Amino acid sequence: MLTERSARVATAVKLHRHVGRRRAGRFLAEGPNLVAAALARGLVREVFVTEVAARRHELLLAAHEASVHLVTERAAKALSDTVTPAGLVAGCDLPATRLEDVLAGSPQLIAVTVEIREPGNAGTVIRIADAMGAAAVILAGRSVDPYNGKCLRASTGSIFAIPVVVAPDVGAAIADLRAAGLQVLATAVDGEMALDDADRL
């Protein structure tokens, strides 16, 4: 059984930070819903689970071939970024999602956020875009890391169902959307048209 001092656990704990995720090309997904969604997407490399959680989620773990490591409760707490650890955490590969790949599919609707910094808000946008049938979400400008734990939880798994693209250059991203034939509409607090009248566009 792995403890919080185990090298494998210590390496995974570094994925709580953006720099750690970027360097490793991996992220952590916690809880049965997110882990199940990540497993279905084929992103899970390994799973850390306590004995109690292993019994509770036996069917979920048995249905996939990812490496499963039993961990102590203290290790599970170190791997968690929530107040109440679920005892089930997956180490996942960051998906390589590019805007050109999304546009190659001739999308009809793409949700774009600009300079969104709050992970909960970003996750909510991803969840809503998925529910609306959008082909992708673009986080443009200096935006939050979509694989931040809070963003993952706010997306309620939608981040595994819809491509999410990080595009630091806002102008270039908008230009690419227009070049692909998409009409670009923006919302603003002081916009010229109310949303109720937007169907005229």
Language-model segments: what does each one mean?
Residues 1-201:
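Post-transcriptional modification and biogenesis factors for structured RNAs
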